[in-house]
Amino acid sequence: MAQHKINYTQNGGLPVALTSIDKIVNWGRSNSLWAMTYGLACCGIEMMASGASRYDFDRFGTIFRASPRQSDVMIVAGTLTKKHAEFIKRLYDQMTEPKWVISMGSCANTGGMFNTYATVQGVDRIIPVDLYLPGCAPRPETLQYGVMLLQKKIRANKASRAQVAKRLM
C-alpha cells in the first residue's frame, strides 16, 4: 500500500482548524495575563499605583503575582544594575512558556541617565523584551495602554501553526 506524505506547509496552508484554535488559545492567553512585577526604582512606584483600585488592571485580566512560576508577563521597572542582571535572568528562566517582558521607563529601556559601569544599559541586553514603555516615570495609564498593546500582540500570534509545522517536518 502506498503512503503519501502530505506537505501542509505548501502554499502556506495548514489545516483550517488551527486558525480557530489559534484564535481561541490566544484570546484566553491575552485575557489572563499574570504579571510578575520587578520594580527597581521610581517606576516601581507608578507600577504599584497601577495595581490599585483607580486603574483596576483586573478588568483587563491582568493579575499581579509574586512568583515567576505563576507568571507569564514580567514587568521590569527601573534601573537594572549588573548585580541584579543575574537574578532577573534567573527569574525569567523560571517563567513558563509562553512568556513576555515589558520594559517600563527610560532606565529599564536604555539605562536612563545612569550611564555608569554598574548599570545595564537596557533590559534587552539580559532578556528579550516584547514591549518598551517610554517615560520617566511612565504613568499608570501608559502601563495600562502597554498591557492592551501586549494583548493585541498575543492575539495576533500564530503559535499552534509553528508548533504543528515543527512536528510535521
Curated annotation (Swiss-Prot):
One protein family per Pfam: Oxidored_q6
Record key words, sorted: 4Fe-4S, Cell inner membrane, Cell membrane, Iron, Iron-sulfur, Membrane, Metal-binding, NAD, Quinone, Translocase, Transport, Ubiquinone
InterPro entries assigned to the protein according to its UniProt record, in alphabetical order: NADH_UbQ_OxRdtase-like_20kDa, NADH_UQ_OxRdtase_20Kd_su
Any one Gene Ontology cellular component term annotated for this protein: plasma membrane
Entry-linked SUPFAM superfamilies: HydA/Nqo6-like
Class of the enzyme per the UniProt entry, highest EC level: translocase
Annotated GO MF terms: 4 iron, 4 sulfur cluster binding; iron ion binding; NADH dehydrogenase (ubiquinone) activity; NADH:ubiquinone reductase (non-electrogenic) activity; quinone binding
Free-text remark on how the cofactor is bound: Binds 1 [4Fe-4S] cluster.
The protein's Enzyme Commission number: 7.1.1.-
Keyword Metal-binding recorded: yes
Main location per the UniProt record: membrane
Record: residues binding [4Fe-4S] cluster: 42-43, 107, 136
Keyword Cell membrane among record annotations: yes
CC cofactor: [4Fe-4S] cluster
Membrane topology field: Peripheral membrane protein
GO biological process: aerobic respiration; electron transport coupled proton transport
Subcellular location: Cell inner membrane
Catalysed transformations (reactions): a quinone + NADH + 5 H(+)(in) = a quinol + NAD(+) + 4 H(+)(out)
Family (UniProt): Belongs to the complex I 20 kDa subunit family.
PANTHER family: NADH DEHYDROGENASE (PTHR11995), NADH DEHYDROGENASE [UBIQUINONE] IRON-SULFUR PROTEIN 7, MITOCHONDRIAL (PTHR11995:SF14)
Assembly, per entry: NDH-1 is composed of 14 different subunits. Subunits NuoB, C, D, E, F, and G constitute the peripheral sector of the complex.
Summary of the function given for this chain in its UniProt record: NDH-1 shuttles electrons from NADH, via FMN and iron-sulfur (Fe-S) centers, to quinones in the respiratory chain. The immediate electron acceptor for the enzyme in this species is believed to be ubiquinone. Couples the redox reaction to proton translocation (for every two electrons transferred, four hydrogen ions are translocated across the cytoplasmic membrane), and thus conserves the redox energy in a proton gradient.
Protein name: NADH-quinone oxidoreductase subunit B
Organism listed in the record: Sulfurimonas denitrificans (strain ATCC 33889 / DSM 1251)
